């Protein structure tokens, strides 16, 4: 079986639970070789974001050229892009290098509520990046921002917004329903072939730092092994649930701790 080379394009997390660090752990845990392009240096920990240093867009583009000119990239995850010019740089390089199997985690806010994408960049992301990617993974506030619409409060409103996002041109949409006030956490997958509901009981832990990053990285790592997004989502969600179930065994930070990416090993 051909080895999988996976790329993450995202910001950093020195505490190791989110961003590039979480993505590379996820790739390794799921048997993919990880490459990375850094868009922002983020001073953050389990308690919140303290500072963000955005990388110059030309240097983001240079990193992408370095990877794509040398390494066969089978799958890509995009996370924090921070600002308009970085979104433009990434969109242009994806087009230039004919990149496939791209999962876009529409990162706008950290778990702590701190902003990770400038408001002006949302339109650029919507117009330049969405039509190029294979799958987007918005939560309900992110979906509302992309659609310039009110936050979905019911599963029916969530369905309507997922269909509207799919119409923007991406191959598939995974709407994450964690913000709904239900005992279970329903997610909906929208593709050109149809719609599929995924639901599981909420894991009883406060340690959920980096779950969005981790899920999108898992989806990217697993996609080349499956025939459909439905199969990919099913395995990625099962793996993430196990990582969440073991999160309390870690002793990381004073705030919202990370999931246990290597729960299968230690």
From Swiss-Prot:
Keywords: ATP-binding, Kinase, Nucleotide-binding, Thiamine biosynthesis, Transferase. 4-amino-5-hydroxymethyl-2-methylpyrimidine binds at residue 44. Disulfide bonds: none annotated. Its EC number is 2.7.1.49, 2.7.4.7. InterPro entries: HMP/HMP-P_kinase_dom, PM/HMP-P_kinase-1, Ribokinase-like. Pathway: Cofactor biosynthesis; thiamine diphosphate biosynthesis; 4-amino-2-methyl-5-diphosphomethylpyrimidine from 5-amino-1-(5-phospho-D-ribosyl)imidazole: step 2/3; Cofactor biosynthesis; thiamine diphosphate biosynthesis; 4-amino-2-methyl-5-diphosphomethylpyrimidine from 5-amino-1-(5-phospho-D-ribosyl)imidazole: step 3/3. It is an enzyme of class 2 (transferase). One of its GO terms (molecular function) is hydroxymethylpyrimidine kinase activity. GO terms for cellular component: cytosol. It catalyses: 4-amino-5-hydroxymethyl-2-methylpyrimidine + ATP = 4-amino-2-methyl-5-(phosphooxymethyl)pyrimidine + ADP + H(+); 4-amino-2-methyl-5-(phosphooxymethyl)pyrimidine + ATP = 4-amino-2-methyl-5-(diphosphooxymethyl)pyrimidine + ADP. Transmembrane segments: none annotated. SUPFAM superfamilies: Ribokinase-like. GO terms for biological process: thiamine biosynthetic process; thiamine diphosphate biosynthetic process. Homodimer. Catalyzes the phosphorylation of hydroxymethylpyrimidine phosphate (HMP-P) to HMP-PP, and of HMP to HMP-P. Belongs to the ThiD family. This is Hydroxymethylpyrimidine/phosphomethylpyrimidine kinase.
């Amino acid at each position: 079986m051909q080895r999988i080379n996976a790329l993450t394009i995202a910001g950093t997390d020195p505490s190791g639970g989110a961003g590039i660090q979480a993505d590379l752990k996820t790739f390794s845990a799921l048997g993919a070789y990880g490459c990375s392009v850094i868009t922002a240096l983020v001073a953050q920990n389990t308690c919140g974001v303290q500072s963000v240093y955005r990388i110059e867009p030309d240097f983001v583009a240079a990193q992408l050229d370095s990877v794509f000119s040398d390494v066969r990239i089978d799958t890509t995850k995009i996370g924090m892009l921070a600002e308009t010019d970085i979104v433009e740089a990434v969109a242009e390089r994806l087009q230039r290098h004919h990149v496939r199997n791209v999962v876009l985690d529409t990162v706008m806010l950290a778990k702590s509520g701190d902003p990770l994408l400038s408001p002006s960049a949302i339109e650029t992301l919507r117009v330049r990046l969405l039509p190029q990617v294979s799958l987007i993974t918005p939560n309900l506030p992110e979906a509302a921002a992309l659609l310039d619409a009110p936050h979905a409060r019911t599963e029916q409103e969530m369905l309507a917004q997922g269909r509207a996002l799919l119409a923007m041109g991406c191959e598939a949409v995974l709407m994450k329903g964690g913000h709904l006030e239900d005992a279970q956490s329903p997610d909906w997958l929208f593709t050109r072939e149809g719609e599929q509901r995924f639901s599981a009981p909420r894991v009883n832990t406060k340690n959920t730092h980096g779950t969005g990053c981790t899920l999108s990285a898992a989806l990217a790592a697993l996609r080349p092994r499956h025939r459909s997004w439905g199969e990919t989502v099913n395995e990625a969600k099962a793996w993430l649930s196990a990582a969440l179930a073991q999160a309390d065994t870690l002793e990381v930070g004073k705030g919202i701790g990370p999931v246990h990416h290597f729960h299968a090993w230690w």
